[in-house]
Amino acid sequence: HAVTVYDSLVTGHKQAVPNDATLVQADLSDSHALIETLTREKFDAVMHFAAFIEAGDSMKDPGRFFQNNFTNSLGLIENAVRAGVKRFVFSSTAAIFQSSEEPLSEESPLGPTNVYGHTKLMTEQTLEWYRQIHGLHFAALRYFNACGALPGRGEAHQPESHLIPL
């Protein structure tokens, strides 16, 4: 497959984009660039990893998180469907679940405890509606706090925000 990376590079890194991939440097809120890219490329699938991830910050500035994590995701989903995309992979989070002393499973009760988790749950629920209405096939990846990246590979945050720095 040919890969196109659509990234504002606000927190991303150009050097992480493979040489054989096409980079479109634009924000998801730029609907003109987004629509142009989606219609020009005729994608088989969209993999959506863009989001603010700092749960604590989401409680200090919720509007910023709702705008970036949910509203921009909705725009991407809607425009992808309009462009004929049939498959969508969404980078969600385990933060959509209620806090629990028990191990979590796919059947665990939903109940985010912060705005970050809520924006991810809203996006998952939106994808389910687009599946029902438009036939969009999707997968939501519900990560836990990641750790264990190899030196020189993986994520790069300044400042580092994970419990176990990558």
Give residue ranges: language-model regions.
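N-terminal Rossmann-like NAD(P)+-binding domain of SDR-like oxidoreductases, especially those catalyzing
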Residues: 1-151
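Alpha-helical structural motif
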Residues: 30, 163-166
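The catalytic Tyr-centered alpha-helix of NAD(P)H-dependent dehydrogenases
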Residues: 112-119, 156-164
